[in-house]
A protein has these predicted regions:
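Hydrophobic transmembrane alpha-helices and their helix-loop junctions in integral membrane proteins
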Residues: 1-169
Length: 169
């Protein structure tokens, strides 16, 4: 949809051409689909259901790699798209920040409670990862330099620590 409006998928070209078509319904729909895709890849609550099973049933060596990289790459790419491709007035005109804050807070609270009960350690760490992703998205949803910086610091520390925890399992 974004390609049909702009004629390109290059991030720099999109950043230059999107202000001209920011008011189009197609652009808003494309933006929504992109954000939903990122939410799925991030395992953002409530679109997180694939992550606990993937971490639990994958071989331990694969789980270490998945836990350290898969969702973190999605956070980084989402940040790039939000802050370099789409114009800031476009993003602020959508309910993206509010949805990130709500889903981040819900993910933190609900998956932290769920993580307290599983008997399988890998499943516990998977639900803990969903909660940590909630913290990262909450920082992004604040739409401030401090929030984004905190999210990036948390992203790197979570990648290192969660990978190490899965190595220990």
């Amino acid at each position: 949809l974004i390609y049909s409006e702009t004629g390109t998928l290059n991030m720099m070209d999109l950043a230059a051409r999107l202000p001209e078509v920011a008011d189009q319904r197609t652009t808003h729909t494309g933006f929504a689909f992109i954000m939903i895709g990122f939410a799925l890849k991030l395992a953002l609550f409530p679109l997180h259901l694939w992550l606990p099973n993937a971490y639990t049933y994958a071989p331990s060596a694969i789980t270490v790699f998945l836990a350290a990289t898969a969702t973190k790459v999605a956070v980084y790419v989402m940040l790039r798209v939000l802050f370099t491709v789409f114009p800031q007035d476009f993003v602020s005109a959508t309910p993206t920040d509010e949805l990130f804050i709500l889903s981040g807070m819900a993910g933190i609270l609900i998956t932290s409670v769920i993580a307290a009960y599983p008997a399988n350690v890998k499943r516990l760490l998977a639900y803990s990862s969903v909660a940590q992703i909630g913290y990262m998205v909450l920082g992004i949803g604040l739409a401030s330099a401090t929030g984004v910086t905190a999210s990036l610091v948390h992203l790197f520390s979570h990648a290192l620590m969660k990978g190490a925890r899965f190595m220990a399992v």
